[in-house]
């Protein structure tokens, strides 16, 4: 059944894979036995098992027998050359002789499947057709018809599919595509129309770039219509079958060929393909334009005037990237404006729950921002990528806040955050964001200067052979930090290195003069520095103290500073000897180039710059953990038409003796003469063939009672079914399955499976206590040692996660208990075999197998449940997420039980429309090979600490590739046993599920509540401008919604309670079918729902006049439609002014 593919791994890991494969075989055999009984659309399990990429490609697109050859070619040549070679061999007829067009189509699909690891649906759904067409001169050329789902392949694979097309064209001896001027201009028009009417591309090409590309690409990039928008200029062209937008073709042209031009050129050079040199000219023209625009290096620029200042002190100007904040959604807060002081401090490193696009934040902050950040919440970020997922890391710098009584404190624990959250006046610093080197490498974003942190400090001490205490690095005392710096001549400890760079030189002198008026005293047995807070000048100085992030208390108009030792020494005052170390402050001030230079002239030791880069972020999607339901939710894929009413209840239809016409495959049983919708007659048990297809009266009553009789059930309660099948053959699912799902309170998806969706979060190491599993159970599952090689005996030991093990949300575990009970009922009552799961509580699920799957793919990945978490996320190894072709930037995927998929999935249920085969397990991977997963994970770093060279090099803002020589990533481990084990991380976290579990966005009710809370958060964050937030919410969310709803109201369809829908109101004003009154599909409330909120927001935050005027115009438009002025009788004299 399964060929065990050799992967480089240890004996322990090999045993783990073998156990998974054995369990898959066992479950497969159970499903095979059940399917042979004939109650399902086919007698076989419809999910082929694949041990590797080659198997997946053959299972997904074929041709038969290609897997072995793919393995040989990939081993010999590598993935990309192998894809081209396999395409050539298909064209040559080595895998079957069929007509020319079919060969070309098979070659392109198979090559694209190899390029996308046989995971995504693009080779099946993204290529609608491949044709051989004629040029005006009579020569033949190749045309690839792309469809919308080609998006799932990603830009690089889209571009390479065009390269494959060219390769196939040459192999078949075809000429190149010769476009007419009208066809060229049609592409220009379509790109512009798509951007104005449908959506934006990742790249915005010029008209000349499009013209150059179309003239030079050797095949025709065309496609089927994907949008209802029609071109107005270049219509009815002989070789273009539609006047509508060809979205798939445009994606391939813009986000494939033009955006990924550098990658195409690399492959062209590597593979020796001719005819693509025009891309070099296109790129050089683009580079020239960029040089003309500005002399900046990408977004980053070093201020040349400051070059003369020593590297650690200089000001580095990094241009803010404002793209992430171009639109703000109502109710979802902005946490920091682009690069604004007080935002997230960039810190390099990886915790056991970060990496692969997920970033770490201090859990205390999550409570301080009113729980709008929870575990798994998506953030749209300024850099290095476009988005990330929030996870807690409590070993990084916490937020610093100012309380309403004037105190400034570091909120370094969740308990402290909960205590002060209602007393916070201002969040001065949001704390660190932990970003791993791999994310910069993946996004090819220049490395930005590292913050001054404990890891860098420790590396300096090690490099200089200076002895130190580990506790001193983590938690130094103020006096100890000063003494250590003076004695060892090293920079001051990061803990007491304040944000001097965020205030001016004059501010520093003002602060110094004020502090020196104070005195040393004791408070509650501790030495403190006390300064008066009386006059306006004192208040200005206190504000500077706040801005540099120095903690202090305010009592009786006095400022009390506990960590005064490093503060005063940094300002040139010897606390120990009560002596001012500065003789001529005016001269020093004059000679200082900037604030950091001034501090270093004042202090008796080196003071490093605390922060070079502040990162902006806003909330994206909230985290998700919920059962997958169709709209509306149904229990089974059994069609009942409109017989069950709006709620689609078959039991109600049976009770009321209702029926309706449905399109189905059926036959008349030769034995009992009754109509059978199944391959086994439900009334007499005779095996039949469904040889008829058409519209019949649904025999609901007969089927209902036959199903109840077979299951031995009297009254199952409400059972929700579908109105009609969307599949091609309209083969129905047995009604018994719907009844059993309803009894167990579970729902069905379009393909017959029962799924649970949750946000993807990576984890490489865990503690047994975090995932609610006993040490004994973990030892049974093969976890017997911790990361230090010690025997696993305690729930707090850190253990490395195996690549196919998953930790599901608690709510998922509870749902899967119901699903397992449904499967067992199905086995026992429907298939008449033994129960399998025998699950009573969620702990019983541990050790069972699931399938993990992403919506844009057609290949599932086998996983094993090893625990559950209270967080609303699905934890899995980064490899597991990558095997689904996902990263972890806030996306969600689904889990479903393996036996559920084997028993209930059928291709016969899949919708007969473009994209219908996406999100369906058309093939299943049993063994995870890191070489065959999404390449993004290969950039994730695997080190236990970053070297000193890395931190030093970041100051030069190099390309991440320039430091690769002293960094280790997953790529360096591929093909070795270490690819699975011994992966390191740099920062610890107490628990992977610290912080709020549910984002406030989901708990708040009305939009008014959400926007009020959103702006309340903005008000208290120093790095956020609440007026700008209000303006952006109104402009990018409310105004487009109001206009769109107004337009929708004027174009709306109407419906009737009988289920009929009409594009326009019928002339008689009532439903022609039943005579009932018609109902609007867009109500007045839907049109004006945001109007009041927008007006209140505009008034309260005094947004600009332009926005206020736009709102006024929209309101007038709404009133003109919905005004209902009572008519009144008027006399002629009313129109005259009577004196």
UniProtKB/Swiss-Prot annotation:
Give the protein's function.
Answer: Possesses two activities: a DNA synthesis (polymerase) and an exonucleolytic activity that degrades single-stranded DNA in the 3'- to 5'-direction. Has a template-primer preference which is characteristic of a replicative DNA polymerase.
Question: Which family, according to UniProt?
Answer: Belongs to the archaeal DNA polymerase II family.
Identification of the protein by name: DNA polymerase II large subunit
User: InterPro entries under this entry?
Assistant: PolC_DP2, PolC_DP2_cat_dom, PolC_DP2_central_dom, PolC_DP2_N
Q: Does the keyword Membrane apply?
A: no
The chemistry this enzyme catalyses reads:
DNA(n) + a 2'-deoxyribonucleoside 5'-triphosphate = DNA(n+1) + diphosphate; Exonucleolytic cleavage in the 3'- to 5'-direction to yield nucleoside 5'-phosphates
Positions of transmembrane segments: none
Return the Pfam families for the record.
Answer: PolC_DP2_cat, PolC_DP2_central, PolC_DP2_N
Share what the entry says about its subunit structure, partners included.
Answer: Heterodimer of a large subunit and a small subunit.
**What is the scientific name of the source organism?**
Methanocaldococcus jannaschii (strain ATCC 43067 / DSM 2661 / JAL-1 / JCM 10045 / NBRC 100440)
Instruction: Name the EC number(s).
Output: 2.7.7.7, 3.1.11.1
Molecular function, one GO term: single-stranded DNA 3'-5' DNA exonuclease activity
HAMAP family on file: DNApol_II_L_arch
The organism's place on the tree of life at top rank? Archaea
Biological process GO terms, please?
Answer: DNA catabolic process; DNA-templated DNA replication
Q: Keywords in alphabetical order, please.
A: DNA replication, DNA-binding, DNA-directed DNA polymerase, Exonuclease, Hydrolase, Multifunctional enzyme, Nuclease, Nucleotidyltransferase, Transferase
């Amino acid at each position: 059944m399964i060929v065990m593919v050799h992967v480089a791994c240890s004996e322990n890991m090999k045993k783990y894979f073998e156990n998974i494969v054995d369990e898959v075989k066992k479950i497969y055999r159970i499903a095979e036995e059940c399917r042979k009984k004939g109650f399902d659309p086919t007698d076989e399990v419809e999910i082929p098992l694949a041990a590797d990429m080659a198997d997946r490609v053959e299972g997904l697109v074929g041709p038969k027998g290609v897997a072995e050859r793919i393995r040989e070619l990939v081993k010999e040549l590598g993935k990309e050359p192998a894809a081209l070679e396999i395409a050539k061999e298909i064209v040559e007829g080595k895998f079957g002789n069929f007509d020319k067009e079919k060969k070309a189509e098979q070659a392109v699909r198979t090559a694209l499947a190899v390029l996308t690891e046989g995971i995504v649906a693009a080779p099946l759904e993204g290529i609608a057709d491949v044709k051989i067409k004629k040029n005006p001169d009579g020569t033949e050329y190749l045309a690839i018809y792309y469809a919308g789902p080609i998006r799932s392949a990603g830009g690089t694979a889209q571009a390479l599919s065009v390269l494959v097309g060219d390769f196939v064209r040459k192999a078949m001896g075809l000429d190149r595509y010769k476009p007419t001027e009208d066809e060229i201009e049609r592409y220009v028009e379509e790109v512009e129309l798509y951007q104005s009417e449908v959506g934006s591309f990742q790249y915005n090409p010029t008209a000349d770039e499009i013209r150059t590309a179309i003239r030079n690409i050797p095949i025709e990039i065309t496609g089927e219509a994907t949008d209802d928008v029609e071109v107005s200029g270049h219509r009815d062209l002989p070789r273009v079958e539609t006047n509508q937008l060809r979205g798939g073709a445009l994606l391939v042209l813009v986000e494939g060929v033009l955006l990924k031009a550098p990658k195409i050129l690399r492959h062209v050079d590597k593979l020796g393909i001719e005819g693509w040199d025009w891309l070099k000219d296109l790129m050089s023209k683009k580079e020239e334009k960029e040089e003309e625009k500005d002399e900046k290096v990408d977004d980053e620029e070093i201020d040349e005037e400051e070059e003369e200042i020593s590297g650690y002190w200089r000001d580095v100007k990094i241009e803010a990237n404002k793209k992430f904040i171009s639109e703000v959604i109502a109710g979802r807060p902005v946490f920091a404006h682009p690069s604004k002081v007080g935002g997230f401090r960039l810190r390099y490193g990886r915790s056991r729950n970060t990496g692969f696009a997920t970033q770490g934040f201090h859990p205390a902050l999550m409570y301080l921002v009113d729980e709008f950040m929870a575990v798994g919440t998506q953030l749209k970020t300024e850099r290095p990528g476009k988005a990330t997922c929030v996870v807690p890391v409590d070993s990084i710098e916490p937020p610093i806040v100012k309380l309403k009584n004037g105190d400034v404190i570091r909120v370094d624990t969740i308990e402290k955050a909960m205590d002060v959250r209602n007393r916070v006046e201002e969040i001065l610093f949001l704390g660190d964001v932990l970003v791993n080197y791999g994310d910069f490498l993946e996004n090819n974003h220049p490395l930005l200067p590292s913050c001054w942190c404990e890891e860098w400090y420790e590396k300096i001490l090690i490099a200089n052979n200076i002895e130190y205490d580990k506790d001193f690095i983590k938690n130094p005392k103020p006096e100890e930090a000063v003494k250590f710096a003076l004695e060892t001549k090293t920079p001051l400890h990061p803990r007491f290195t304040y944000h001097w760079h965020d205030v001016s030189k004059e501010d520093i002198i003002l602060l110094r003069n004020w502090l020196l008026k104070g005195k040393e005293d004791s408070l509650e047995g501790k030495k403190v520095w006390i300064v008066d807070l009386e006059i306006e000048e004192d208040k200005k100085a206190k504000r500077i103290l706040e801005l540099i992030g120095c903690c202090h208390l305010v009592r009786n108009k006095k400022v009390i500073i506990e960590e005064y030792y490093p503060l005063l020494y940094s300002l040139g005052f010897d606390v120990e000897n009560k002596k001012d170390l500065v003789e001529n402050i005016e001269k020093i001030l004059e000679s200082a180039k900037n604030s950091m230079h001034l501090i270093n002239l004042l202090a008796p030791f080196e003071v490093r710059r605390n922060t070079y880069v502040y990162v902006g972020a806003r909330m994206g999607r909230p985290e998700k953990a919920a059962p997958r339901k169709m709209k509306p939710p149904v229990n089974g894929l059994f069609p009942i038409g409109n017989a069950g009413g709006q709620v689609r209840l078959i039991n109600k239809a049976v009770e009321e003796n209702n029926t309706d016409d449905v399109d189905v495959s059926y036959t008349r049983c030769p034995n009992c003469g009754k109509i059978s919708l199944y391959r086994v007659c439900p009334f007499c048990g005779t095996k039949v063939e469904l040889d008829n297809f058409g519209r019949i009266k649904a025999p609901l009553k007969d089927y209902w009672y036959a199903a109840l009789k077979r299951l031995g059930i009297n009254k199952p309660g409400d059972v929700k079914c579908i109105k009609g099948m969307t599949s091609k053959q309209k083969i129905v699912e047995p009604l018994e399955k719907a009844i059993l799902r309803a009894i167990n309170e579970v729902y069905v998806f379009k393909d017959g499976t029962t799924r649970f969706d949750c946000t993807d979060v990576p984890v490489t190491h865990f503690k047994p206590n975090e995932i609610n599993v006993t040490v004994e159970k973990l030892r049974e599952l093969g976890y017997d040692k911790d990361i230090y090689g010690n025997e696993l005996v305690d729930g707090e030991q850190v253990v490395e996660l195996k690549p196919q093990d998953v930790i599901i949300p608690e709510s998922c575990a509870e749902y899967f208990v119901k699903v397992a009970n449904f499967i067992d009922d199905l086995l026992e009552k429907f298939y008449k075999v033994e129960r399998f799961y025998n699950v009573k509580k969620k702990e019983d699920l541990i050790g069972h197998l699931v399938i993990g799957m992403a919506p844009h793919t057609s290949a599932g990945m086998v996983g094993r449940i090893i625990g559950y978490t209270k967080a609303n996320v699905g934890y899995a190894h980064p490899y597991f997420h990558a095997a689904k072709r996902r990263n972890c930037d806030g996306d969600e995927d689904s889990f479903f039980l393996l036996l559920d998929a084997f028993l209930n999935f059928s291709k016969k249920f899949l919708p007969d429309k473009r994209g219908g085969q996406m999100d369906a397990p058309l093939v299943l991977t049993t063994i995870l090979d890191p070489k065959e997963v999404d390449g993004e994970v290969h950039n994730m770093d695997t080190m236990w600490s970053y070297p000193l060279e890395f931190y030093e090099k970041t100051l030069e803002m190099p390309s991440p590739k320039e430091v690769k020589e002293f960094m280790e990533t997953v790529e360096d481990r591929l093909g070795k046993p270490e690819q699975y084990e011994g992966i390191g991380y740099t920062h610890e976290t107490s628990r992977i599920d610290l912080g709020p579990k549910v984002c406030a966005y989901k708990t708040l009710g009305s939009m008014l509540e959400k926007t009020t809370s959103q702006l309340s958060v903005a008000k208290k964050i120093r790095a956020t401008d609440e007026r700008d937030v209000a303006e952006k919410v109104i402009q990018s969310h409310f105004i487009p919604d109001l206009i769109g709803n107004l337009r929708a109201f004027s174009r709306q369809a109407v419906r009737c309670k009988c289920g009929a829908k009409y594009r326009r109101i019928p002339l008689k004003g009532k439903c022609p079918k039943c005579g009932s009154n018609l109902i609007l599909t867009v109500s007045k409330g839907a049109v004006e729902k945001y109007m009041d909120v927008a007006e209140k927001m505009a008034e309260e935050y005094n947004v600009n006049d332009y926005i206020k005027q736009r709102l006024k115009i929209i309101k007038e438009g709404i009133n003109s439609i919905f005004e209902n002025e009572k008519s009144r009788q008027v006399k002629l004299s009313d129109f005259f002014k009577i004196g």
